[in-house]
């Protein structure tokens, strides 16, 4: 049988072995060359939604970075829930006037209302006072657990500074910048750890007698005879009774506001520049005890002053009514308090 044509081109065994070796070598070299220049992808394809969100986030970040230099950052702020009020023609819309303490405050303002409450309490009941170690104190059986403390120009700065606080409270009713000076003696009434009363006294040499009308004297005698005693004594124990009294115009005013004095001066030793008691403690005998203590301790020699040696500065209608009851006559001594430019502190 005739051989096929392929048989004529079939290499020998030796040549075939060599060719196979050469072919294997050439194939390994080709594989090495292909692997050296190949880029192998080792990541997995992400979802289309994730890719879009990442691209969008990157665009937003680039936009914010570009505008950060010109546009300030918007920090989140806490909401302020402010109480608003409607203006409907109220007379006290902006500021409200307290009829008891006289202070003005803005209703709805938390800080303003808090300050008013603090001032109102101090004015009505007295300034807080814890006491001092070295006190010139006076006591009375009529006022159990209460005392009067005297402060003078030679006392410590802490004592004098406290007096200045009390005087500021007194100025609400009595006016500013005239009550206190360096040569005054101050008497503080202490009750329930509060300063509820204050008397300011100064040395004087003369005063003038007040001229009172006969009608004022008759009115005073009528009130003195009709008023019951406020103290009850059981042996050595004295009880003070509180009296609730209606504040009528005739009780606080014995004249028409005009003060006329005699031209001839009378000798006097102690001038009462100002006397004040907190509103919640009035009509309890505190002002009377302050005056009695002043008479006992004002002079350095220890002698007690007579009532006729005391004089009031220009009193108000309420002060004149109190002075008439204390002295037992409407014709007591008055003097003009001078403005002395020397500070107490």
From Swiss-Prot:
InterPro entries: AcTrfase_ESCO_Znf_dom, Acyl_CoA_acyltransferase, ESCO_Acetyltransf_dom. It is found in: Nucleus; Cytoplasm. Its EC number is 2.3.1.-. Disruption phenotype: Embryo lethality, but normal endosperm development. No effect on pollen mitosis but minor alterations in female gametophyte development. Defective microsporangenesis and anthesis. Major defects in vegetative growth and development, as well as complete sterility; these phenotypes are partially restored in plants also missing WAPL1 and WAPL2. One of its GO terms (cellular component) is nucleus. It holds the Pfam family zf-C2H2_3. GO terms for biological process: anther development; cell division; developmental vegetative growth; DNA repair; double-strand break repair via homologous recombination; embryo development ending in seed dormancy; embryo sac development; establishment of meiotic sister chromatid cohesion. CDD domains: NAT_SF. GO terms for molecular function: acetyltransferase activity; zinc ion binding. A zinc finger (CCHH-type) spans 96-120. Keywords: Acetylation, Acyltransferase, Cell cycle, Cell division, Cytoplasm, Meiosis, Metal-binding, Mitosis, Nucleus, Transferase, Zinc, Zinc-finger. Expressed in roots, stems, leaves, young seedlings and flower buds. Detected in the embryo, but not in the endosperm. Autoacetylated. Acetyltransferase required for the establishment of sister chromatid cohesion. Involved in preservation of genome integrity and meiosis. Required for DNA repair and for the regulation of chromosome segregation during mitotic cell division. Knock-down mutants are extremely dwarf. Regulator of sister chromatid cohesion in meiosis which negatively regulates cohesin association with chromatin, acting as an antagonist of WAPL1 and WAPL2. Belongs to the acetyltransferase family. ECO subfamily. This is Protein CHROMOSOME TRANSMISSION FIDELITY 7. It comes from Arabidopsis thaliana. The gene is CTF7.
């Amino acid at each position: 049988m005739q051989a096929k044509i392929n048989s004529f081109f079939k290499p020998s065994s030796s040549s075939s072995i060599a060719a196979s070796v050469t072919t294997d070598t050439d194939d390994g070299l080709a594989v090495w060359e292909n692997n050296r220049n190949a880029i192998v992808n080792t990541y997995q394809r992400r979802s289309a939604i994730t890719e879009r969100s990442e691209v969008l986030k990157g665009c937003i970040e680039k936009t914010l970075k570009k505008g950060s230099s010109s546009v300030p950052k918007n920090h989140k702020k806490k909401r302020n829930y402010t109480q608003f009020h409607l203006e409907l023609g109220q007379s006290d819309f902006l500021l409200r006037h307290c009829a008891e303490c006289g202070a003005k405050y803005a209703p709805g303002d938390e800080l303003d209302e808090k300050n008013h409450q603090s001032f109102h309490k101090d004015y009505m009941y007295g300034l807080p006072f814890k006491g001092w170690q070295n006190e010139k104190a006076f006591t009375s059986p009529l006022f159990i657990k209460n005392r009067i403390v005297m402060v003078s120009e030679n006392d410590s700065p802490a004592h004098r500074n406290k007096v200045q606080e009390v005087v500021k409270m007194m100025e609400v009713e009595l006016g500013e910048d005239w009550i206190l000076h360096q040569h005054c003696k101050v008497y503080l009434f202490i009750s329930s750890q509060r300063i509820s009363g204050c008397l300011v006294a100064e040395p004087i040499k003369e005063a003038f007698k007040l001229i009172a009308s006969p009608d004022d004297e008759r009115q005073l005698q009528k009130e003195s005879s009709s008023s019951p005693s406020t103290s009850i004594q059981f042996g050595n124990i004295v009880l003070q009774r509180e009296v609730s009294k209606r504040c009528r115009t005739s009780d606080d005013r014995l004249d028409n506001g005009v003060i006329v004095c005699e031209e001839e001066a009378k000798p006097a030793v102690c001038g009462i520049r100002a006397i004040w008691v907190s509103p919640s403690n009035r009509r309890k005998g505190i002002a009377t005890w302050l005056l009695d203590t002043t008479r006992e301790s004002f002079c350095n020699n220890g002698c007690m002053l007579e009532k006729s040696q005391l004089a009031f500065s220009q009193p108000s209608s309420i002060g004149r009514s109190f002075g008439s009851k204390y002295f037992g006559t409407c014709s007591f001594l008055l003097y003009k308090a001078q403005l002395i430019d020397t500070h107490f502190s």
